[in-house]
Each structure stands twice: as structure tokens, then as C-alpha cells.
């Protein structure tokens, strides 16, 4: 990969998309919630307990191991598609944790560090352009062009190959902040 200027970026999507980990390590789940089944769909409806030190120890251990396996220096942590209302809203110890940390609403959890690289996969190009203008670097993986597990009739491979990751209308001075593109594949759909 390095010879072809490709950085392989592993993704461990947390705190959502965590059913397999929670089934394997039940101590990571919210105590009041039943164990999820291991699904074969994009949205598993499970989330770690954000108040548990065991959660952070587990995630830290996984990230440390990934960092030793992938030399690119970047790990994608996802952070999307968490069903906050279903799993965290109304849970007293989570609400107490949020209050203690000064987190007023669940969307406040989505604030980004200024150094965060944004992996743009869905929504208006204006969102990504604004993030770039605010100083973020972006990987453009807009789903209608880069999700290579889609039916060949809907997204021919030739269309993915021809995709230009620089957003239309992005001022040239920002082009270097577009790091490239990512192509996604979900093997359960192949």
C-alpha cells in the first residue's frame, strides 16, 4: 500500500455499532439493557456504556492493538449512527455523568477536536466545505460514489474510479485539505 501512496485506515466504530463487542464482553453494556443479538445490518442498535471505565479500557486496548498493526498513524473511530435516545436518554447514571462533564445535550457529544480529520460520507457538500474552511482535513467518501458494495447497476466500478474527491466549488487554496477518498465495502452485502 505504501508503495502506491495508499494509507490503510482501520475503522472501529464507537460508541455505536458495538453489538459484537458487547455480546463478547457483556460487562461493557448498560446494565439495564438486554444483550443485543449479533446482527448483519448497518445499524446494530447497541452502544457502549460511556460512564464505565471498563469501556475506556476496552477501547484503549483495541486502539493500541490496531496502532501496532497499521503503520498509517490514523484510526477511524466512527462516532456515527448512535441511537442516543434509545440507549442513553433517561438513564440516571448517564445523565449524572453528562451533568458532571458539562455536556448539556447528546448532540454536544459530537463536538470535534480542531485536529480531527473528517471522513465525509453523507450529506451536503456544503457541510464538508464548511469544515474545510474551518481548518479541518477531510477524506471524501461520499456514499453515492465510493460505496463499492453497491449493485454494479447502481454504481458501476468505472464511476467510482473516475470520482474526483475535491468538492465542486472548493476554493483552490483549500484543495490540500482534501486528503483523498475512501472506498467502503460492507461484506455482509456482497
What role is predicted for each listed range?
Residues 52-76, 81, 99-190:
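Substrate-binding groove of N-acetylhexosamine-processing glycoside hydrolases
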Amino acid at each position: 500500500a505504501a508503495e502506491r501512496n495508499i494509507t490503510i485506515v482501520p475503522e472501529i466504530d464507537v460508541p455505536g455499532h458495538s453489538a459484537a463487542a458487547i455480546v463478547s464482553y457483556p460487562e461493557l453494556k448498560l446494565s439495564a439493557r438486554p444483550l443485543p443479538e449479533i446482527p448483519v445490518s448497518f445499524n446494530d442498535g447497541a452502544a457502549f456504556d460511556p460512564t464505565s471505565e471498563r469501556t475506556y479500557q476496552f477501547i484503549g486496548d483495541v486502539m493500541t492493538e490496531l496502532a501496532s498493526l497499521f503503520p498509517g498513524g490514523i484510526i477511524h473511530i466512527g462516532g456515527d449512527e448512535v441511537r442516543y435516545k434509545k440507549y442513553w436518554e433517561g438513564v440516571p447514571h448517564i445523565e449524572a455523568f453528562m451533568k458532571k462533564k458539562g455536556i448539556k445535550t447528546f448532540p454536544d457529544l459530537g463536538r470535534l477536536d480542531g485536529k480531527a480529520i473528517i471522513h465525509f460520507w453523507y450529506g451536503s457538500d456544503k457541510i464538508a466545505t464548511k469544515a474545510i474552511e474551518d481548518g479541518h482535513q477531510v477524506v471524501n467518501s461520499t456514499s453515492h460514489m465510493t460505496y463499492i458494495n453497491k449493485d454494479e447497476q447502481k454504481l458501476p466500478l468505472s464511476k467510482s474510479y473516475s470520482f474526483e474527491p475535491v468538492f465542486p466549488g472548493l476554493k483552490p487554496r483549500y484543495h490540500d485539505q482534501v486528503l483523498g477518498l475512501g472506498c467502503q465495502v460492507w461484506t455482509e452485502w456482497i
